[in-house]
A protein has these predicted regions:
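ATPase catalytic-site recognition across NTP-hydrolyzing enzymes
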Residues: 1-25
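Acidic two-metal-ion nuclease catalytic site recognized across multiple nuclease folds
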Residues: 7, 210-239
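An active-site-proximal beta-strand-loop segment
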Residues: 23-36
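Anionic group-transfer/hydrolysis microenvironments
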Residues: 26, 129, 206
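Intrinsically disordered or highly flexible coil/loop and linker segments, enriched in small
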Residues: 32, 118-121, 176, 200, ...
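Mg2+-dependent endonuclease catalytic cores in nucleic-acid-processing enzymes, primarily RNase H-like
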Residues: 37-39, 44-194, 239
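Acidic, Mg2+-coordinating catalytic module of metal-dependent nucleases/exonucleases
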Residues: 191-223
Length: 239
């Protein structure tokens, strides 16, 4: 799994289309427990054509690009004509930031809020389990008017290992990047030894974020995107 991470060597991150934070809560300082953990992930387009297609898919069948391209689509051009057959057009994911720390509830809420503000997060993901509800409620009560929103995520019936396996293909396809930092190494290291490592808090946040992005259609690969758009244009009569 380590070899599948792409190394981001540039000094700055690219412009992100979406920034998602993923939280695994503990809000206890007991040393025998996993600490709370937060990872921040950015989605960025491979090229301009990807932005065109993404804008179409994610905005209820309305093109956000210029009028010329919109006219081409209205005249019956396939989206494949706008999106070159290039792997670079697949959206990429960047691990932008992470931390782990044992904190009581007030300190945890404050640190999460500060992180979301500093990283310009759009959505904060929190697992919808009983242990996380107090954190979610406090964040909504104190920071409900901030630019970032809180999204509760149902993990479903799958266990932690199954959830990570469900997004493993994203790593093998080479679309996930991380900078050369100590905090990024902590995330990569936990993923590498999972499920045999001492802690798995960062792994949980990783699978939660990637699974959310995949299931909400943000991380759609080029062939899937073309098929979806072309399929949406097929006229279906009444049964």
């Amino acid at each position: 799994l380590r070899d599948w991470w792409g190394l981001w060597e540039a000094d700055a991150y690219p412009r992100m289309d979406l920034v998602v934070a993923s939280l695994d809560t503990a809000y206890t300082t007991k040393q025998e427990n996993d600490p709370s953990a937060l990872t921040v992930w950015g989605v960025f387009s491979g090229d301009a054509a990807s932005s065109i297609a993404t804008g179409f898919v994610n905005r209820s069948n309305r093109m956000r690009n210029n009028e010329r391209e919109a006219a081409r689509f209205d005249q019956g051009a396939k989206i494949a004509n706008l999106l070159p057959d290039d792997p670079a057009s697949t959206p990429r994911i960047m691990l932008m930031y992470s931390w782990t720390q044992r904190l009581e509830l007030p300190e945890l809420v404050q640190k999460v809020a500060d992180s979301c503000k500093r990283m310009k997060v759009d959505i904060l993901l929190i697992e919808s389990k009983a242990a996380c509800m107090s954190v979610a409620q406090e964040l909504l009560r104190l920071y409900g008017r901030e630019d970032w929103g809180v999204q509760l995520v149902n993990p479903g019936a799958n266990d932690k290992l199954a959830r990570l396996y469900s997004v493993q293909h994203l790593f093998s396809e080479g679309v996930i990047y991380a900078p050369d930092t100590t905090w990024a190494e902590a995330v990569i290291g936990q993923c590498e030894v999972f499920p045999k490592g001492k802690h798995d808090d960062l792994v949980d946040t990783t699978s939660q974020a990637l699974k959310y992005l995949r299931e909400t259609g943000v991380l759609v690969r080029q062939p899937e995107r073309i098929a979806e758009i072309n399929d949406s244009r097929v006229h279906r009569g009444k049964p």
